[in-house]
Amino acid sequence: MPGAEPIRLWDLWPELYDRTETSIIDPHYVHQGAWGAKCIARRSPAEHIDVGSYLPWVAFLTCMTQVVFIDMRPLGEKIEGVRCIAGDLLSLPLKSRSVHSLSCLHVAEHIGLGRYGDGLEPRGTQLAARELSRVLAPGGELLFSVPVGRPRLCFNAHRIHSPGQILRYFADLQLVDFSLVDDSGRFRPNSSPAEAKDAHYACGMFRFRRAALAS
């Protein structure tokens, strides 16, 4: 076409399925990202530690704080404002009761299934929850999300947990609030965990806090 850039056969890159009537999103990741960022912005921590969450979201957090990112697969690229540490969610390289702002979003359901090169561990989510709880400081907050609904294992992709399971796994923490992306993709803030118990594949977002030490 006149005025167009040069075109060669080996530069062709056909995209045939983008002519949709509405924009396509993954509601779990879009809504949990906005939810998590708002929670962190309200607290405005000097440093935030994330374990294995969606990397573009982790990079976005550098707009408001310094971030330590822990993952079993270290980053190959440097991201300004992000310090990367290689680590296993079942054995975090952190001292007990040391972290004041912590997140682990849509991660724990994969632990122990071998999908990412880790060993098999049937109690993967439960042990991950125990480790996250171990490192959370008094007065600290944990943002945690997993697929919720009727509990089952979808090997080797992920697990789906009942909200009650997650509350039991974090029994030594206080649930501050719970939000939900339901099976229709609708975000439902400040919901009751019981509302998700019969879901097929919802996203449960739990904000936990460890009680502050008595003065």
Model-derived segments and spans:
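Conserved N-terminal segment of class I S-adenosyl-L-methionine
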Residues: 1-91, 97, 105, 212-215
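Class I S-adenosyl-L-methionine
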Residues: 163-213
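Short conserved AdoMet
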Residues: 62, 137, 171
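A conserved beta-strand element that flanks and buttresses the S-adenosyl-L-methionine
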Residues: 103, 108, 112
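A short glycine-rich, Lys/Arg-flanked "PGG" loop and its adjoining helix->strand segment in the class I
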Residues: 120-141
